[in-house]
Each structure stands twice: as structure tokens, then as C-alpha cells.
Amino acid sequence: MNSIVSKYTQSTNNDDPKKIIEEEGFTNRFDVVPVPQSSLYLRNLTDETKNKHCLIKMNHGTTTLAFRYQHGIVVCVDSRASAGPLIASQTVKKVIEINPYLLGTLAGGAADCQFWETVLGMECRLHQLRNKELISVSAASKILSNITYSYKGYGLSMGTMLAGTGKGGTALYYIDSDGTRLKGDLFSVGSGSTFAYGVLDSGYRWDLSKQEALYLAQRSIVAATHRDAYSGGSVNLYHIDENGWVFHGNFDVDSLIWEAKDNENSFAHIPR
């Protein structure tokens, strides 16, 4: 009993937080393979362009999109997870709710995106506690891009968007596993992004109403799921304004296709 009391009643002034975290087994780093050049070793195992006999083939696909307009930001994604030619799941949540004001999307390797965006969430919370204010989307995106750049060449697979509001207002950024960081008003990432862009480019404008923006995002994902075998399942729809993000629902792709066929006279090649 005395040992328990002493452990949890010591003054924190002399405690080293980093040491405590490492002793408890928690860390925001991961170990690399103990070989002379870890990046080359991992690339040889995962990069099919460098080694056609590679043991780990990172085949994946998805469709995610986000865009800014006059009333905020819309984020929309599908829910299919693929493992090469196989459908691993139809109910994957590809929007990571980092905090009530910031969302991250998932494209590429699910584990990489989930792990590092969880780490980002901890960093954002620490910033808020230290500075008594929300972190800006720009600063959050810079943290994530610095992390991914530090592991460039080590086999990470990430193509994520960060959308949110904070100090500096609403903003949208694209970050990938090479450390690339781009600010923009419209992005679509994943194997189905070409099809999503086809709808977005024809319907996007800055002065969209909120309902028009939500429908455009939803309709773009539907088009991508129809043409891209690696996208499908259902559509998850979010909206962000100065008060934070709001989840607008999960919608079945098949139902949305039939709805578009009836209301727009589109998908005419699909027989009843």
C-alpha cells in the first residue's frame, strides 16, 4: 500500500514526463529495422517498382474529398477498405475526428494514417493546454508534415487531408508520406479521385449554398464508387464551420445511385 501511495503522491516538479512515458511503454515513435540502411531494406520489401518479387505489396484504393466554400468546408469519403483484389471491409471510418474542430482523412495505409493522426491529436491537445488556445489548422498540418518527412523513405503510405477551424479561421491542407504539404480550396485523394474530380470540377463554385455543397460532395463520391472498384460501401459526410465540425450522416451508395438515377436522369446505362 505504501508503494502505491508513494508512486501517486510524489511531487511532479522533479518528474521527467518523457522518462515516465517511456517507462510506461507509451511513445510517439516506432522502431525501425536494425539494418545499416532501414529505408532501402523496407523499400526492397514494399516497392514493386524496385523489386517485382517484393513480399509486401501495398495495394489499396479509396476516394476522399474536401473543399472550401463560402460557408465553411465539406469533407466526404467512402467506406470500402481493399487489400489487393479483395474487399477487406465495407464499413471503414475514413474520417478521423482529431478533435471537435479538426478532421483528418484516411487514404493509403490505414494503420499509418490512424497512428500518426492520433499522435497529431495528442500534439494538438498539448498545444491547447500550454497556450490556452486552439491550434491553427496551419500549425497542425505542419506538425504532421514534419513527422512524415522525418520518416521519408521508410515505407509510410499516407495521403491525408486536414480540414478544420481554429486560430486563423477555417483551412484545408493536403499532407502525404513524403512530407508534402499543400494548402488549397479543393482536394480529392485516392484511386477514385479522378472520377470525383469529374463531378467536382463541373459543379464547384465558391458561392454554393450549404445544401448544394453537401450534395455536390456526396454526388462526387457516388460517381467515384460507381466507376472505381476500390471505392464503395457507404458515404460519410461532414461539414465544418467556425464552430467546429458536424457529422451529417452515413448514406448507402446503392441507394444514392438509384436516387440520382430517378432525380437527375443520370446513370441511364444502369438497367432497372
Swiss-Prot record:
Signal peptide: none annotated. It holds the Pfam family Proteasome. It catalyses: Cleavage of peptide bonds with very broad specificity. Residues 1-61 form a propeptide. The active site is at T62. One of its GO terms (molecular function) is threonine-type endopeptidase activity. CDD domains: proteasome_beta_type_5. GO terms for cellular component: cytosol; nuclear envelope; nucleus; proteasome core complex, beta-subunit complex. Its EC number is 3.4.25.1. It is found in: Cytoplasm; Nucleus. One of its GO terms (biological process) is proteasome-mediated ubiquitin-dependent protein catabolic process. Keywords: Cytoplasm, Hydrolase, Nucleus, Protease, Proteasome, Threonine protease, Zymogen. The 26S proteasome consists of a 20S proteasome core and two 19S regulatory subunits. The 20S proteasome core is composed of 28 subunits that are arranged in four stacked rings, resulting in a barrel-shaped structure. The two end rings are each formed by seven alpha subunits, and the two central rings are each formed by seven beta subunits. The catalytic chamber with the active sites is on the inside of the barrel. Belongs to the peptidase T1B family. The proteasome is a multicatalytic proteinase complex which is characterized by its ability to cleave peptides with Arg, Phe, Tyr, Leu, and Glu adjacent to the leaving group at neutral or slightly basic pH. The proteasome has an ATP-dependent proteolytic activity. This is Probable proteasome subunit beta type-5. It comes from Schizosaccharomyces pombe (strain 972 / ATCC 24843) (Fission yeast). The lineage of its organism: Eukaryota, Fungi, Dikarya, Ascomycota, Taphrinomycotina. The gene is pts1.
